[in-house]
């Protein structure tokens, strides 16, 4: 939160993967900041299509007391432990000496175990230079070391977020460097069940991809957002890059009823 304040942001979204564990700590930190910062509570929900394509859905301002959504997030978190063990087994089979204990050192209390922690372990072991390199070389969706985990279908994930009063945004839908992306017909199906927006302005989208996604969003009646996808010092993304316009945010905010933006 302090980094967001120092970057001059008015609003920042907290969307850890498949968890709301950081909400209270983040909200409590606002009063000590040098500037007035609004906190948008949410989660980045891991989903998977029937064609086994990984999809990330940003759920914002939902009611975390909603039982069905909370259980779906818990199911995904629980499956990440055996998944991590299998990824490590595959890496070690290729001669890459990393252990589960190495990964655990990079997982904060309450955090959702995931590939970023494995990436940080590879950096600490000097196997790669940074987290982005770890994903490029070993951890992307097309890698032989990649292992999937239990995830809701994106259609169901959107329905869960909307039923909990939240906003549903399809994250980095054209980030081909991460792996196969859903096609326009799949996005149209998501729009039919309540998807609010496409995250168009993102570091992983070139100008041609952004133009294509803007056209698709207009055709489907979806709003257009931007995001830094900031993950801390381990990732090259700058906090505050690729922002969402005030006009778009105000329209999204008007659709949410699960929880409110938090101010100190």
Predicted regions and their residues:
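An N-terminally biased module of ancient metal coordination in phosphate/nucleic-acid-related enzymes
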Residues: 1-52, 139-140, 152, 158-159, ...
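Active-site gating loops and adjacent loop-to-helix segments of metal-dependent hydrolytic enzymes
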Residues: 48-81, 120, 124-143, 240-262
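Short coil/turn linker and secondary-structure boundary residues
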Residues: 64, 98, 113, 152, ...
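Conserved acidic, metal-coordinating active-site core of Asp-based
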Residues: 108-175
């Amino acid at each position: 939160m302090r980094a967001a304040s120092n970057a001059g942001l008015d609003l920042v979204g907290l969307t850890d993967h498949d968890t709301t564990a950081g909400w209270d700590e983040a909200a409590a930190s606002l009063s000590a900041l040098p500037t007035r910062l609004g906190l948008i509570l949410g989660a980045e929900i891991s989903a998977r299509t029937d064609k086994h394509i990984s999809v990330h859905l940003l759920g914002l301002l939902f009611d975390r007391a909603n039982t069905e959504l909370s259980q779906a997030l818990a199911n995904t978190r629980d499956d990440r432990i055996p998944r991590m063990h299998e990824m490590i087994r595959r890496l070690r089979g290729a001669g890459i000496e990393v252990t589960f204990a190495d990964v655990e050192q990079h997982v904060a209390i309450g955090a959702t175990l995931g590939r970023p922690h494995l990436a940080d372990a590879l950096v600490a072991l000097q196997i790669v230079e940074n987290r982005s390199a770890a994903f490029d070389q070993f951890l992307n969706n097309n890698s032989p070391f990649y292992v999937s985990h239990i995830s809701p279908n994106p259609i169901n994930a959107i329905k869960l977020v909307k039923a909990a009063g939240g906003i549903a945004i399809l994250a980095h839908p054209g980030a081909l460097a991460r792996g196969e992306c859903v096609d326009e017909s799949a996005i149209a199906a998501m729009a039919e069940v309540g998807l609010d927006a496409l995250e168009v302005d993102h570091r992983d989208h070139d100008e041609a991809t952004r133009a294509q996604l803007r056209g698709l969003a207009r055709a489907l009646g979806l709003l257009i957002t931007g995001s830094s996808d900031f993950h801390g010092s381990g990732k090259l993304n700058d906090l505050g890059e690729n922002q969402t316009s005030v006009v778009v945010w105000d329209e999204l905010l008007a659709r949410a009823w699960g929880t409110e933006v938090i101010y100190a």
